[in-house]
Amino acid sequence: MGPMGFVAVGVGAAVGAWLRWFFSVTWNAINPALPYGTLASNLVGGYLIGLAVAFFETHPSLPPEWRLLAVTGFLGGLTTFSTFSSEVIANLMAGDYRWAMLHLAMHLGGSLLLTAFGIWSYRALA
């Protein structure tokens, strides 16, 4: 990949990380046991990756930098498996097993459902 690929990933990642930070500072304090900002980042990212998968599947002639910008950069910066993991572990270490399991179910199940819904949405509108 050429220099434009690096630029595309970097720009997308910066914007995605800023949005994730905004979600976190806006919503995480509402419920520390299930930080809504992290959940929003992962669910919105799950839906958008579904849209992106369907979009790029139907537009194979687009330059690869667009996929790098949107998927690797923006969605990689927006979604956060590491923060999600640390929040689940914090719940487990505090003995909040119910919150830990709810956290797991909402992030993983919700993201998978919204990814499928994103693909379906794009195909329904295309």
Swiss-Prot record:
Pfam families: CRCB (PF02537). The chain crosses the membrane at residues 5-25, 36-56, 69-89, 99-119. Keywords: Cell inner membrane, Cell membrane, Ion channel, Ion transport, Membrane, Metal-binding, Sodium, Transmembrane, Transmembrane helix, Transport. Its main location: membrane. It catalyses: fluoride(in) = fluoride(out). It is found in: Cell inner membrane. Na(+) binds at G76, T79. Belongs to the fluoride channel Fluc/FEX (TC 1.A.43) family. Fluoride-specific ion channel. Important for reducing fluoride concentration in the cell, thus reducing its toxicity. This is Fluoride-specific ion channel FluC.
